[in-house]
Design a protein with these regions (language model features):
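Flexible glycine/proline-rich, aromatic-decorated loop/lid segments
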Residues: 256-273
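Short coil/linker segments at helix-helix boundaries
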Residues: 2-58, 63-151, 158-198, 208-218, ...
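Soluble catalytic regions of membrane-associated enzymes that act on cell-envelope
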Residues: 202
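TPR-repeat structural position
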Residues: 42-43, 135, 185, 220-221, ...
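Active-site-adjacent "gating/activation" loops or surface patches in catalytic cores
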Residues: 205
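Helix-coil-helix junctions within alpha-helical repeat/solenoid scaffolds
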Residues: 301-328, 334-477
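Solenoid-repeat scaffolds in large eukaryotic assemblies
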Residues: 45, 93, 156, 188, ...
């Protein structure tokens, strides 16, 4: 093994896929690129595939990997690329696709099939219908590959990914437990569960990762717990994969384990951050892992863990990162600056909420400012100062109007201005409750629940818990 490979500091486990290359270094870098792509760290994945290409410019699968890593994914479809980023990305992908096609004749039949399929993944235009058409074309192409090579675990994972991206975060109807109309959730469930019966499947990060994403929105998320337990320590330095089991831990109420997995994920993320910094899109996943640790601690009643995680998250989220325009980092990340408010509300730390300063940059920190108004409003209501709570409620309403529709909430893929409508109703309920208008208060909280239920699936907000607590307080009263 060459010097470059020996110096690579990330423990990615042992997963390996042999590709057509006589260069051992190229093979090592290819494996790393593939694992990182399964871990949704697409920038590091692309970097590894570029290293593989540098070692063996004739390896078609390295170009395939580069094109795949730079394309759309479950958390970032084509329409969430900004214009400048999209143009640059498509140029790189198109070059990689050409090179992959040129070198494919020297590859295996399966590799040639993958190279042919990924050609369909590039949109013919830059409109919404172009993105939809290329996603459908790619899924159809991968279906043909799967029909020929259905026992291959990588093919199964890539096919599952292509189909799930047609209905990303909308795979199941959360009210009925049935597949969302038009989705192919049961089909994906069938071939992923077929793959889960194969030998060595529990060493495959892609299958395990996608099965968790598939089942977390279903009415039976617990069926994926075995897969989650195998994924938990499979790729120790891929923070997102270490975090993924906590999606299920939270849903089944295993908050202690959710805290443990997310704590490990944050350490892995910090290891990467210490070497590469935070000026990359993976910072979104890094923030999500902190956020998940915080939420698990909130559900478990562990204020110390939650507040320590908030402080770590805030230290790694400077204004310089939020100011990056392409991709528009403020749209993806600024909402995480507001998470401290949720923690202080959850643990009833009213004086700390009232002492929270407002950021100076009202445009950059528009979500954070709105959330602070929400938190201060709850604090004033809880302390019996209804007049000041109403003042904060009015300020919250105006602050929400200033949030651009492009700002994503921490509960991806929901938008911040939509999610804060839940907060408005919750605050209305708190104020009415303190005014003694219990029926009105509960109607507001029911409205908050209704708005919360209308959101696209994401890690849960504790609206129902708040409503239940309020009813309990009324009974005690």
């Amino acid at each position: 093994m060459g010097t470059a490979s020996k110096s690579y500091q990330y423990n990615l486990g042992t997963y390996h896929r042999k590709v057509t290359t006589a260069n051992a270094e190229a093979q090592v870098w290819f494996d790393r690129g593939l694992i990182w792509s399964y871990a949704f760290h697409h920038e590091e994945s692309a970097r590894c595939f570029e290293k593989a290409i540098a070692e063996d410019p004739g390896c078609a699968m390295s170009y395939w990997g580069l094109a795949f890593a730079l394309g759309p994914n479950y958390n970032k479809p084509w329409d969430l690329f900004d214009e400048k980023e999209l143009k640059k990305t498509l140029e790189t992908i198109e070059h990689a696709l050409t090179e992959a096609k040129d070198h494919a004749p020297d590859s295996t039949e399966l590799e040639q099939a993958l190279v042919d399929a990924v050609q369909a993944r590039v949109p013919k235009g830059l409109q919404e219908h172009d993105f939809k058409a290329c996603n459908e074309a790619y899924a159809k192409a991968m279906e043909s590959v799967y029909e020929r090579f259905s026992d291959d675990l990588d093919v199964t994972a890539l096919f599952a990914d292509s189909v799930m991206n047609l209905s990303a975060w909308d795979l199941w109807d959360l009210k009925t437990g049935k597949p969302t109309p038009g989705s192919r959730s049961l089909e994906v469930k069938g071939f992923l569960e077929k793959a889960l019966e194969q030998d060595n499947v529990y060493e495959h990060p892609g299958i395990l990762h996608l099965y968790i994403h598939l089942m977390e929105m279903s009415s039976t998320p617990e069926v994926a717990l075995v897969a989650a337990d195998h994924l938990r320590n499979l790729v120790p330095d891929a923070g997102h994969l270490v975090h993924m089991p906590s999606h299920l831990d939270i849903l089944v109420g295993d908050y202690r384990r959710a805290i443990a997995s997310n704590a490990d994920a944050c350490l892995a993320d910090e290891k990467y951050h210490n070497e590469h910094g935070g000026d990359n899109f993976y910072s979104f996943y890094r923030m999500h892992d902190y956020h998940s640790l915080i939420y698990a601690a909130m559900f478990a009643g562990q204020s110390k863990v939650a507040l320590e995680a908030v402080s770590r998250m805030e230290r790694s989220l400077p204004a310089s990162l939020l100011s990056i325009e392409s991709p528009p980092m403020a749209d993806w990340l600024e909402n995480f600056s507001s998470v401290r408010v949720h923690v202080l509300v959850r643990f009833g730390r009213w004086q700390e909420l009232l002492s929270l300063p407002f950021p100076n940059d009202k445009d950059l920190y528009c979500v954070t400012i709105a959330m602070i108004h929400y938190g201060k409003g709850v604090a004033y209501a809880a302390m019996g100062d209804v007049e000041k709570a109403l003042r904060e409620r009015a300020a919250l309403k105006e602050a929400v109007k200033r949030i651009p529709s492009s700002r994503i909430c921490g509960d991806f893929p929901n938008k911040s201005n939509v999610v804060l409508k839940v907060g408005e109703a919750m605050l209305d309920g708190e104020i009415a409750y303190r005014q003694g208008d219990y029926d009105v208060a509960f109607r507001h909280l029911e409205e908050a629940i209704k708005r919360d239920d209308a959101l696209t699936y994401a890690e849960p907000w504790p609206v129902r818990i708040l409503s239940d607590l309020s009813h309990s307080r009324d009974i005690d009263h």
